[in-house]
Amino acid sequence: MIGSKVLLCYFLLSIGLVQIDAAPSDKCKTVFSSRVKDSLCGAKEYMTIQEADMDKMMDCVLRAVNIVDNTGAGNLKSLLEPMREIEVDGWKHKLNIESCTTTTMTKTLPEPQRAHAFYKCIMKTKSKKTFKEEFNKRVCGHGSAMNFFTP
């Protein structure tokens, strides 16, 4: 009896997790094709992808993996610890994330453009390599983080 209840709870929990996982990728499918994903994941520096609406794509993708917050600004709480695990220089990363999440950027740009602006900014800092490694873990499936965006 207890075993069947445990099994039922496990089953219901796993269905809930699958639904949570499915939401971001389904939401971003129209702006994040596998071709666009390959271009973005393979990039070593900031580049514009011609066939993508960069603002819409970055807004959707970066929100889905919690790299930016609900306003489109860089999410320091979500990024700092994972970036410190990759490279210990936490002060550099904190400063760079904060400088790319300035009030000027988050208040003057329209909300749908903020995530793209954050990505573009952080990819021009000394934290670029570490950020890109964390980005690739979350978005591209490189590393141990969950990949929301399998084509």
Q: What residue ranges belong to the model's regions?
A:
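Mature soluble extracellular domains of secreted precursor proteins
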Residues: D21-P151
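Cleavable N-terminal signal peptides of Sec/SRP-targeted secreted and luminal proteins
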Residues: G3-A22
